[in-house]
From Swiss-Prot:
The lineage of its organism: Bacteria, Bacillati, Bacillota, Bacilli, Lactobacillales. Gene3D superfamilies: Aspartate Aminotransferase, domain 1, Type I PLP-dependent aspartate aminotransferase-like (Major domain). GO terms for biological process: L-histidine biosynthetic process. CDD domains: AAT_like (cd00609). The gene is hisC. Its cofactor is pyridoxal 5'-phosphate. The modification N6-(pyridoxal phosphate)lysine is found at K207. PANTHER family: HISTIDINOL-PHOSPHATE AMINOTRANSFERASE, HISTIDINOL-PHOSPHATE AMINOTRANSFERASE 2. The keyword Transmembrane does not apply. Transmembrane segments: none annotated. GO terms for molecular function: histidinol-phosphate transaminase activity; pyridoxal phosphate binding. This is Histidinol-phosphate aminotransferase.
Length: 350
């Protein structure tokens, strides 16, 4: 018998997590360098007896650490179980079922999923032929805007003055700026918080802070926005961040010098790798992230993807996404790893 009322949902397709050992994993934009020594120490010294109790409701220690680091009052932060948790709540808090929200046609795939799930109408705005966000496309009537900056999967960064132009022209709706990759060479939109109360910024600990397996993220916004999204949080899952995540996230923020150093290494390797690929004919989009989106030379994206995988090198291929089906997204690992990737590519070209 048919069961009534079941939702038809097209889910987000996450990158694979191979169980093999001795691989080079460059398909989900993780950080190859690992957490700081302070995080290791915080994990080793965590009192497991604390786990008998629920976690804190407001993650005071982590919010204070972030406030000290970024110079934003503690009451303008909300902590989540990864930035996906924050973004999901933001869709519920800031958008409605009457007005279309807008976001790029090539961006984080979850935006479309959340819009469908929460029955929020949306319009995907095509990137330019050079895969950039055209400011003029966002100076139109809408019910909200979501921009990933730098963007994914392109890696392209939109300068802050252009982002501000979009924010300034849309002060009657919320503009979400997903800064998952901001610490790989971009300029943060945090200064806009002092000028506009419709800006909501999200960040994750999964990329720069090497804590993808922990699931910690946060949002930053005006008191007006925080009141609404906190109401959503407390209506859905008040205890959304576990005690270990708060302790280790706090340790990461308090040891941020370590992460600045490894981000600098990743950026240097990214720029070197991009130049080397261009030298052998690849088209490489300019990146301010911990990955590059490349169009191979001499072989198809599918052929290169299969060859790399046969050598236990995992990258991301988007065969069903028409505009980038001829490209691969390659996360930036250590210098040694990327040298091995380059050698493997050259082997196929030979």
């Amino acid at each position: 018998m048919e069961i009534k009322g079941l939702r038809k949902i097209e889910p987000y397709v996450a990158g694979s997590q191979p169980a093999e050992k001795n691989i080079i994993k460059l398909n989900t934009n993780e950080n190859a360098y690992g957490p700081s020594p302070a995080v290791h120490q915080a994990l080793a010294s965590f009192d497991a007896h604390q786990l008998r109790k629920y976690s804190t409701l407001d993650q005071t220690a982590l919010r204070q650490a972030l406030s000290d680091q970024l110079g934003v009052p503690t009451d303008q932060f909300i902590i989540g179980n990864g930035s996906d948790d924050i973004l999901s709540m933001a869709f519920l808090a800031f958008f409605n079922s009457e007005e279309k929200i807008i976001f790029p046609d090539l961006t984080y795939g979850f935006y479309k999923v959340w819009a469908d799930l929460y029955r929020i109408p949306f319009r995907e705005v095509p990137l330019t032929s050079s895969f950039e966000i055209d400011t003029q496309d966002y100076l139109v009537e809408n019910g909200g805007i979501i921009l990933t900056n730098p963007n994914a999967p392109t890696g392209i960064y939109k300068p802050l003055d252009q982002v501000e132009e979009i924010v300034k022209a849309n002060q009657s709706v919320v503009v979400i700026i997903d800064e998952s990759y901001i610490n790989f060479g971009g300029e943060t939109a945090l200064p806009l918080l002092e000028k506009y109360d419709n800006v909501f910024i999200t960040r994750t600990f999964s990329k720069d802070a090497s804590l993808a397996g922990l699931r910690v993220g946060y949002g930053i916004g005006s008191p007006k926005l925080m009141a609404v999204i906190n109401a959503v949080k407390n209506s859905v899952n008040p205890y959304n961040v576990d005690s270990i995540a708060e302790a280790l996230g706090t340790a990461a923020v308090r040891s941020w010098d370590y992460y600045e150093d490894i981000c600098a290494k990743i950026m240097a390797t990214r720029d070197w790798f991009s130049q080397e690929l261009q030298a052998i004919g690849f088209d490489v989009l300019p990146s301010k992230t911990n990955f590059v989106l490349v169009k191979p030379y001499g072989v198809t994206a599918g052929q290169l993807f299969a060859y790399l995988q046969s050598k236990k090198i995992y990258v991301r291929y988007f065969p069903k996404v028409e505009r980038i089906s001829d490209r691969l997204r390659i996360s930036i690992g250590t210098q040694d790893e990327m040298e091995r990737v380059l050698m493997t590519i050259q082997e196929l070209q030979a």
